[in-house]
Amino acid sequence: MFSKFEFDGKLNPTFVEGAFKLPLSSIRAYLKEPISPRFIHVGSAGITRPDRAGLDLSKQPPAVRLNKELDFILTFKLKQGEDLIRESGIPYTIVRTCALTEEPAGANLIFDQGDNITGKISREEVAQICVAALESPYASGKTFEVKSVVPFSEPFTVDPQNPPPEKDYNVYFKTLKDGITGKEILEHDPVPV
C-alpha cells in the first residue's frame, strides 16, 4: 500500500489508485497483563474424535458417529472454527461442552482436556463458565471439555431451600494446560473439583 503523497507533500510516483489490502498477523493493542480472554468460543466435545485411530464409534455420541453423513460438520468446526481462533492471536478460551440440557446450574463438574469425555451439562452452567472465563487470566489460551457428574439417566434438580454454593471457576481454570487441543491423545484422568 502506498500513500498518494510522500512525506514531503509531493506526489508519490509509485501510488496506484484502487483497492488495497492490509493483512494482519494478529490483533493486540493496549492489553494489560495478565491477559484475560477477549473471545470465548462454545464448541462441541468430540470435535477431534472422528479422525482418531482405533476409536470405537459405537460408543461415541451421534455427531461423532455420523460426522461423514453430516457433511463433516465436526471437522469443519475444528478447522474453520477452533484452529482459526487459535491462530488469530486474540486471547481466547474454547469451551467444549458435552450434551446441553435445560437443567439448572449447580451440579458438580468435571473439566478435562484432550477431547475424551462424554456426558451432559446445563446451558445455564455453560453461560456461567463463559462469563467467568472472560474475567480469568487462567482461562486464556485454553481449550477444555466440561460436563456434570450427573449421569444422563438422572435429572439434576436444585432444592430452592438449599441451593448449591456458587462455584469459583478459577479452581477449574488453574488446572488446565496450554496447548492441549485434543488432536494429541492424552493418557490421564479427568480432574473433578
Model segments located where?
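Oxidoreductase cofactor-interface core, primarily capturing Rossmann-like NAD(P)-dependent enzymes
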Residues: 1-7, 17, 25, 31-193
